[in-house]
Amino acid sequence: MRICLNNAFGVDTSSIFDDEKNVICKNFKDKEKMRRAGCTAATILDRLCAFVRPGMNTHEIDEEGGSMMRDFGVKSACKGYRSGNRIFPSFTCLSVNDEVVHGIGLTDRVLQEGDVLSVDVCIRENGVIGDNCRTIPVGVVSSEVDRLLRITEESLYVGLREALHKKRVGDV
């Protein structure tokens, strides 16, 4: 199912899809709830990234993320997520180095100086989901890793500037 956010960002997206039968147009109240959930997730993400230090295990970081969610009065959209007979056990998704995405917080996964950590915070607030992710250096990283992180972030913003009304993913 696709969601059409008419004027959510000041852009009319009402005709973005050729097939309108699967489009749910959100009203202003729904869009504000989505924006608030995104902002809450972003705030938790900022604080959780600042918490990360070499020598911590990913379970500690995940537990801190769960604690922050409780402090904000929101729930994790990850923990307890069901896919078939599998249930996701963590509050956050924490992926180290070459792990792709949706890593689980583990007590035996200890962060080392120079690692790279992707932190994904996905929350439920007022019936909607806010989801933010960031990849950060753990302590001091090599110049190659620092360059990779910098260029990757710059590329994200270049892509966002090109993600315009009626453009296809291949155009971006």
Give the positions of each predicted feature:
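Active-site neighborhoods and metal-handling regions in enzymes and metal-associated proteins
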Residues: M1-V172
